[in-house]
Amino acid sequence: MSAEDPNAGEDADAEEEEDIRYFVRIGQTDLDGTKSVERALTELNGIGHRAARIIAQKADVDRRAVFGKLDDDVIERVVERVENFADDVPEWMTNHQKDYFTGETTHETGNDLQLTRRQDINRMKMIDSYRGVRHKRGQKVRGQRTKSTGRTEGTIGVNVEAIKEEQAEDAAAEDDE
């Protein structure tokens, strides 16, 4: 900042803010460009904190860098790592191991993940597997206890206030007699 132009520092900050891409599109999802690479990638369905950190590391990107300020070629590297995530990590870290029809292990993201999960559940329902039957009935699927938790119906309890009001009315009626 100089004496001649008191706003010189503010113009540089304004230009720096204008260089940012506020939305970065990966697949069918718009990611927030004002967040760090790691935080922005977690907005994508199927990518958690650990996966986002691995993607940033494999793409040679600082995970704390602002996503919208990255160059196009760096963003392309990140997109490529997201698409090929299953190749970079062990099989146990992917979200869709051993596909029923193809036997492949993939890592689904975005709408593909939701579609794949829905198809798997519908297939289990159709073949009447144990998990499919539990899904059909709307019960817990993964072995949780159901005796006391997960009840969906309304409670059939005692309304203490109503009883006290009735008792007060009865007592008042007896006093009047």
From Swiss-Prot:
Membership in a protein family: Belongs to the universal ribosomal protein uS13 family.
Disordered: annotated segments: 132-177
Top-level lineage group: Archaea
Name of the coding gene: rps13
Entry keywords, A to Z: Ribonucleoprotein, Ribosomal protein, RNA-binding, rRNA-binding
Subunit structure: Part of the 30S ribosomal subunit. Forms a loose heterodimer with protein S19. Forms two bridges to the 50S subunit in the 70S ribosome.
The protein, known as: Small ribosomal subunit protein uS13
GO BP annotations, alphabetical order: translation
One cellular component term from this protein's GO annotations in UniProt: small ribosomal subunit
Ranges annotated as biased composition (Acidic residues): 167-177
Annotated function: Located at the top of the head of the 30S subunit, it contacts several helices of the 16S rRNA. In the 70S ribosome it contacts the 23S rRNA (bridge B1a) and protein L5 of the 50S subunit (bridge B1b), connecting the 2 subunits; these bridges are implicated in subunit movement.
Organism lineage: Archaea, Methanobacteriati, Methanobacteriota, Stenosarchaea group, Halobacteria
A molecular-function term among this protein's GO annotations: rRNA binding
Ranges of Basic residues composition bias in the record: 132-145
Keyword rRNA-binding tagged: yes
